[in-house]
Amino acid sequence: MSLTETPICNFGEKAQSFNLLSTNNERLTLNNIKGKNGTLIMFICNHCPYVKAIIKYISEEVIFFETLGIKSVAIMSNDIKNYPEDSFENMIKFSKLYNFSFPYLIDSTQEIAKKYKAVCTPDFFAYNKNLELQYRGRFRELKNMQTDKK
């Protein structure tokens, strides 16, 4: 996925269900990962310079969200033939490198990304406790942020 204009948030839209493989070799569903007070679904990948620029901050924020009862999950939907850096093996390495405290799932058919209408990486979808969309968009302004060289 490339940098594109994020569509307007359709407030109240329900989260789409999924059943995907995590980097811990577990199949996880939306019901498995939803939080008591909310759920953050992030579409990311390993090779994206924008993801690399903010991944440390994402990891830190997710820990804070957890204290609020908000669970987080990241989904990688890129075609690994076109982006070998995003392979499942590299997802495992990436999640360990950045100490992910949240599940990192592979969507190898892009079915889930299409259901969510994810258009770029990173693309964030924040839901309330009833899994109704409250925010859709970017993490924060990316101007002047440097790519992590790890």
What residues fall within each predicted segment?
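Chalcogenol-based redox active-site neighborhoods
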Residues: M1-K150
